[in-house]
């Protein structure tokens, strides 16, 4: 399988280390180079503020890599993966989490298959709105998973619509418990949307998740 970095399937040169890149092999079997691995990101927790963007085109992805953006989140449509593949190839050295559609997996086995499909085409991790059971199944299969807490748009009916959450004690405790459940399920990170900054500061002190 061709390398995302070299294009010819060969192991990247050791000189990659001099450029601050890590030599890797993807779950799909492609050699490549990345600015970060999951281990690197976890090692940075509490030490460095990283930048992330969501590119919607190959031009945006290439520009983000050139600008030194640390990580990218890429929308992944398993029925039409061509754009995700093109974005991966446009920014071959940047750590990418592919965002998997919630309704694309109805069982734990389907979640694992979907995660593998994303990893096969070059994802370094998957970002999901899955239940803890699905996350646990995927992580046990070796797939790095990022959960989703706080305001989860596709589940917003449970939190009163598209609005901030965590502004009272009950909601704050609920968010914290949700994040700890994801942590126990094996996730390495969690996206937390539209919650008070002070709450997030306190929660991050109490979890290993990024």
What name fits each language-model region?
Residues 2-209:
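Alpha/beta enzyme core
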